[in-house]
């Protein structure tokens, strides 16, 4: 079964069948704000697509549930980003989104159990659950699910971490390419200066010195060999430097010693180095793509196994041409029919990081052993080869240094050796991972790097015609390998050196090195990178100095031009200068006055704003203080008064809440039934308690001295069976005839026989302060009221709720209208009085 590339734990039960992958149903449950959520790097739709891609590899997606804990959302994101996340999830479609206010994960567990109960008949076909939570590995739900044959995958983070590393590597490569482009642009700018010839010569000399220094570093690194213990019993030979002189071929299509190179200068070699750059083909393949490619090529590559490759290395008889020895591939014998069984994380207790497999340490050791053995083999083969000329060495050093990105060899690279004979055919071996048809498990992501030869002749080209049959179709028998090797090399007498190379296996590779992830750089590679970085820094410093010189020259020219312009202005007539000066002074004075006025206005505005801000702050502080006081008062009211919890569950808050609810029912006179306890317990916990969660609480209560009776559906603590009134089972035998008669007499005297609800009736009865009923507890009063309802003495009518609410605003409106009319009458009277006063004044005047 495929393992998620960024999963922390993968629990598998049962056999590894492809039917489960096709017919099985998958449920995804993501605790949103209990996992790292890098919104700045990835979008929500990208993360959801990653999870769906992983779930599709396990089976058919039946349910996708996301639970959002709003209490943790405030610590993770702002309200605006939370709304954006919520909107993107709703636009994605097909996702159940739930918002909760508690972080106890009870909602998540209940949703998982609901999914299992709905799809429990699919366990035989395969039922898989993906749990995304930072504490997913410690979830108590893992054990009961695996015991029932249900598969579960736990993901600590929904985002793959290796993508970040690939992006960082790509960014580094892009930065290096940009630096190279900037260097070329700076060189072109320097050519425009007066000292173009001198600068170009200095740059070429510096580049030659740097290239020689880099080649000297490569030679020192090739002389170093570090031997470490390999994961496999046999030694694996591997070349650390694919650009060394051992790979300089003298074939028809691969000749390093060109005819024109002997007559060229060092500068021409540097300028033409781009045409002879190394060809590096890097293919990054993820596990689903690689497995799909494997299934398509099973018919063509079914017979290619490591046993046939090893027999090819032992049975074939290559022929030496007398000039140089040949390099062949020899691959160790590995058995792919019986892969090791996967480890169970439940039994072993080991967890691996998203980028580290259990065999990563051993593979790192094997890669180190590859490098040391390859150096020893190459040193022994160089003693049998003729010494190259000085021109070939210089050309090889310049070819290595001319590449734009000089990077150390990767641990997952396969050096494809070319024939040194008379033919120019290229015969790369196919990847062993594509030829294995017996392994059922999918492959983890790996980086396969094919390093081709660094140089070719100008007339040679890589076409399908030049490739050997190995590149187009894989051979099925060792005889075809032998025929290929005999056809590619001319017939001549064999030597003891070629046989020893084949028997010892000069270049051998293992399947595990192809499947392992990228290893960290070795000390040799780090040294080489440091030297290359120092050289690049030196080049940048030189270019910066040249740029500074150019800037200084430009500044001098500008100063000279300004000086000439100033002299011309001074040569003007004195009257014009005086007029211009006066005008400028007047303008400056006006501008200063305007600026002062604007500053005064701004200061006044700032003062007003500061005063308003201070007032608002004082108001906010007062409001916050009032809110805090109200919250404290509410908290004190909600806290149970003088309740001492037993010592056996002091640390368990749920059991404490259950104990307080039972004690409260005891004081109110209610019988502690499931129906009465469940809503009150939810109010105490501040959440809605589901039935499945309540059953778990009951299981814990059994182990902490709570007596639970499923026949009567009651809960008591130890032997404190205080009884209590049950409104759902109201009976007359629980009360005396005098108490019942007192309530009936009250109803008959008041003539109130219809109530909106039982709650309103209970409140009305308690407010009457009857002598016998006032001595009863609240639960008993509720049961007594229920008896009158059952005996049809009193009836309930919910329509009264609507009438009481609608009549109140009508009465208010009538009162308002009356008040308005009275005000109008008063105004009219005032107007009349004013008119009378005016008439009296007029008469007096007459």
Swiss-Prot record:
Region (Disordered): 159-217, 254-276, 332-414, 459-501, 556-651, 803-846
InterPro entries, A to Z: Sip5/DA2
Biased composition (Polar residues): 459-482
Transmembrane spans: none
Amino acid composition bias (Low complexity), ranges on this chain: 163-217, 355-414, 483-501, 568-642, 811-846
Top-level taxon in the UniProt lineage: Eukaryota
Protein name stated in the entry: Putative uncharacterized protein DDB_G0288537
């Amino acid at each position: 079964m495929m393992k998620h590339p960024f999963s922390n734990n993968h629990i598998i039960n049962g056999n590894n069948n492809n039917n489960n992958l096709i017919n099985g149903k998958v449920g995804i449950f993501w605790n949103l704000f209990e996992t790292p959520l890098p919104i700045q790097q990835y979008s929500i739709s990208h993360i959801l697509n990653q999870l769906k891609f992983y779930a599709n590899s396990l089976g058919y997606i039946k349910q996708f549930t996301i639970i959002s804990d709003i209490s943790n959302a405030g610590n993770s994101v702002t309200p605006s980003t939370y709304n954006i996340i919520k909107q993107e999830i709703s636009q994605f479609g097909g996702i159940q989104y739930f918002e909760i206010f508690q972080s106890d994960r009870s909602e998540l567990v209940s949703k998982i159990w609901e999914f299992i109960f709905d799809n429990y008949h699919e366990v035989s076909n395969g039922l898989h659950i993906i749990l995304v939570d930072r504490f997913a590995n410690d979830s108590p739900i893992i054990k009961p699910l695996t015991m029932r044959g249900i598969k579960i995958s736990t993901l600590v983070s929904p985002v793959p971490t290796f993508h970040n590393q690939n992006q960082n590597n790509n960014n580094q490569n892009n930065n290096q390419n940009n630096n190279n482009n900037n260097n070329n642009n700076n060189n072109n700018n320097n050519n425009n200066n007066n000292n173009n010839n001198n600068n170009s010569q200095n740059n070429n000399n510096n580049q030659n010195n740097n290239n020689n220094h880099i080649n000297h570093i490569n030679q020192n690194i090739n002389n170093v060999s570090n031997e470490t213990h390999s994961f496999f019993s046999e030694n694996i030979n591997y070349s650390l430097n694919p650009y060394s002189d051992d790979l300089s071929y003298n074939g028809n299509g691969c000749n390093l010693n060109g005819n024109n190179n002997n007559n060229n200068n060092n500068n021409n070699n540097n300028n033409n180095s781009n045409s002879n750059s190394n060809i590096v083909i890097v293919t990054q393949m993820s596990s689903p793509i690689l497995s799909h490619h494997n299934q398509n090529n099973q018919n063509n590559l079914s017979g290619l196994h490591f046993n046939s490759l090893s027999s090819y290395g032992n049975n074939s008889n290559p022929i030496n041409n007398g000039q140089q020895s040949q390099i062949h591939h020899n691959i160790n014998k590995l058995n792919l029919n019986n892969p090791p069984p996967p480890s169970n994380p439940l039994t072993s207790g080991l967890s691996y990081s998203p980028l580290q497999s259990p065999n990563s340490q051993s593979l790192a050791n094997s890669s180190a052993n590859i490098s040391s053995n390859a150096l020893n083999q190459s040193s022994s083969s160089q003693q049998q080869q003729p010494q190259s000329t000085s021109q070939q060495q210089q050309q090889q050093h310049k070819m290595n240094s001319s590449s734009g990105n000089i990077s150390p060899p990767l641990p997952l690279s396969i050096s494809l050796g070319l024939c040194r004979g008379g033919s120019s055919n290229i015969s790369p071996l196919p990847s062993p991972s594509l030829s294995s048809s017996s392994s059922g498990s999918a492959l983890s992501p790996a980086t396969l790097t094919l390093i081709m030869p660094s140089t070719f002749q100008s007339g040679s080209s890589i076409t399908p015609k030049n490739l050997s049959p190995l590149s187009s179709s894989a051979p099925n028998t060792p005889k075809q390998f032998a025929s290929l090797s005999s056809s590619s090399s001319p017939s001549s007498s064999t030597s003891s050196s070629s046989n020893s190379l084949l028997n010892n296996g000069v270049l051998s590779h293992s399947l595990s090195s192809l499947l392992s992830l990228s290893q960290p750089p070795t000390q040799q590679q780090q040294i080489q990178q440091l030297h290359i970085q120092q050289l690049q820094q030196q080049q940048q410093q030189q270019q910066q100095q040249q740029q500074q010189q150019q800037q200084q020259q430009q500044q001098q020219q500008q100063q000279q031009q300004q000086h000439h312009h100033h002299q011309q202005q001074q040569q003007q007539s004195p009257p014009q200068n005086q007029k211009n000066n006066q005008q400028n002074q007047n303008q400056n004075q006006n501008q200063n006055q305007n600026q002062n006025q604007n500053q005064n206005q701004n200061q006044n505005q700032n003062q007003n704003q500061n005063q308003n801000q201070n007032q608002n702050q004082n108001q906010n502080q007062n409001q916050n203080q009032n809110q805090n006081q109200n919250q404290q008062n509410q908290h004190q009211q909600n806290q149970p008064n003088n309740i001492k919890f037993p010592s056996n569950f002091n640390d368990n808050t749920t059991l404490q809440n259950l104990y307080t609810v039972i004690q409260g029912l005891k004081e109110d006179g209610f019988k502690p039934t499931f129906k009465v306890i469940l809503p009150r317990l939810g109010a105490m916990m501040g959440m809605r308690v589901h039935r499945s969660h309540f059953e778990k609480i009951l299981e814990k209560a059994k182990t902490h001295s709570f007596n639970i009776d499923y026949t009567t559906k009651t809960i008591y603590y130890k032997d404190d069976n205080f009884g209590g009134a049950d409104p759902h089972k109201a009976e007359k035998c629980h009360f005396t005839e005098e108490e019942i008669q007192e309530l009936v007499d009250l109803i008959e005297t008041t003539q109130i026989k219809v109530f909106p609800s039982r709650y309103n009736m209970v409140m009305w009865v308690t407010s009457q302060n009857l002598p016998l009923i006032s001595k009863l507890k609240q639960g008993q009063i509720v049961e007594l009221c229920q008896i009158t309802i059952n005996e049809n003495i009193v009836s309930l009518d919910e329509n009264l709720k609507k009438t009481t609410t609608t009549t109140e605003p009508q009465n208010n409106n009538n009162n308002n209208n009356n008040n308005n009319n009275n005000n109008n009458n008063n105004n009219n009277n005032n107007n009349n009085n004013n008119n009378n006063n005016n008439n009296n004044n007029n008469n007096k005047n007459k």
